[in-house]
Amino acid sequence: MTVYHFVGIKGTGMSPLAQILHDTGYTVQGSDIEKHIFTQKALEERNIKILPFDPDNIQPGMTVIAGNAFPDTHPEIERALSEGIPVIRYHKFLGEYMDSFTNVAITGAHGKTSTTGLLAHVMQSAKPTSYLIGDGSGMGKENSEYFVFEACEYRRHFLSYHPDYAIMTNIDFDHPDYFSDIDDVFDAFQNMALQVKKAIIACGDDEHLPKIQAKVPVVYYGFNEENDFQARNVVKNTEGTTFDVFVRNTFYDTFYIPAYGNHNVLNSLAVIALCHYESIDVELIKGALTTFGGVKRRFNEKVVGAQVLIDDYAHHPTEIEVTIEAARQKYPDREIVAVFQPHTFTRTQQFLSEFADSLKKADYVYLCDIFGSARENIGKLSIEDLREKIPQAQLIAEEDTSVLKAHKDGILIFMGAGDIQKYLRAYEKVAV
């Protein structure tokens, strides 16, 4: 049997794919940078070998799965190609692998990781389900009937997939280093829609999704009356959210989620609609929704003294806004403090005013230096450009986070897609 070698095994898609193959009986190893990344914990728990990059890692009899971030000139990939060892790109491998299951792609500008995690959790309570989540979580079951996976629109990678079902949470302009404008993003989703084989579950409240053309039924969900699956009578409190679901204006059932904010109601509606389409018992759906513990880096809370520290991946103005909204629902009488690290210079430049507007919804704002991704080295702007747009915003450095102690019973939300967790960990050390 071949050994699967992952070039870039700590990637948020690569790590869960390695976990899935390992769980289903394959021999798996991989290589990556030596810096610790949160996605490696699940690999280490399975004793999956993680090696430093080295062309000598490549041996006869292997199949190389290459991460999207690594060009054909990467030393390991070069070695494999020169020795005739098969090299398959991550998204191509995944596209072929999923064909042996009833598979569901979850895509959208925002909410796809949380929705993938929620759907995997609910489906597992009904049928054997394998899943791949963009928070680095993956699980393979040998007898799986379903495969639930997160599909990213960046660089149109999701066009490698021809899923049975697609959940589309929303369309928004992001990844300005690749997409030129919202029309370019819409075009990518439109092409994806034409590749779906059974049905699309799409948010009808979204500005763009109702314009999607498809060869299969499109089932819409949302708060508005024209949706096929509609949430009504929404009751929010500090314990979570309860809502009624109407299917084409007929009462279906009442659901409770231990989650906050309208975006989590919408994510749940998407899952309810898909499960209804697959004839999963409503009592199973209701029960599983109440026990979902969330996904990594999405509103993860930790109590430190009188403060609550929240770690969240929010890195787009829309995501910042809904994260602050969720915190206000759960902690209506507490001070909300945003600690934000912008992710990539191109995104910060593109959305400078929108970032300022969304962050102003917090009571206090602290800004970390911009995190440049592997895709770019230097930008034309600095964090000062954002600070100037937010009155009273302060800059904060990893070396000195003690200023946050002033917010004695505050809700501190650390947001960003870079290494904002460094700031959170630094503050934890001085907080008590």
Swiss-Prot record:
The UniProt record lists the keyword Hydrolase: no
Broad EC category: ligase
Pathways per UniProt: Cell wall biogenesis; peptidoglycan biosynthesis
Pfam family, one: Mur_ligase_C
Reactions accelerated catalytically: UDP-N-acetyl-alpha-D-muramate + L-alanine + ATP = UDP-N-acetyl-alpha-D-muramoyl-L-alanine + ADP + phosphate + H(+)
Keywords, sorted A to Z: ATP-binding, Cell cycle, Cell division, Cell shape, Cell wall biogenesis/degradation, Cytoplasm, Ligase, Nucleotide-binding, Peptidoglycan synthesis
SUPFAM superfamilies: MurCD N-terminal domain (SSF51984), MurD-like peptide ligases, catalytic domain (SSF53623), MurD-like peptide ligases, peptide-binding domain (SSF53244)
Localization (cell): Cytoplasm
InterPro entries referenced in this protein's UniProt entry, alphabetically: Mur-like_cat_sf (IPR036565), Mur_ligase_C (IPR004101), Mur_ligase_C_dom_sf (IPR036615), Mur_ligase_cen (IPR013221), Mur_ligase_N (IPR000713), MurCDEF_pg_biosynth (IPR050061), UDP-N-AcMur_Ala_ligase_MurC (IPR005758)
Annotated GO biological process: cell division; cell wall organization; peptidoglycan biosynthetic process; regulation of cell shape
GO cellular component: cytoplasm
Main location: cytoplasm
One example GO MF annotation: ATP binding
Annotated residues for binding of ATP: G108, A109, H110, G111, K112, T113, S114
EC number: 6.3.2.8
Protein's job: Cell wall formation.
Family recorded in the similarity comment: Belongs to the MurCDEF family.
NCBIfam families, per the entry: murC (TIGR01082)
Stated name of the protein: UDP-N-acetylmuramate--L-alanine ligase
Gene giving rise to this polypeptide: murC
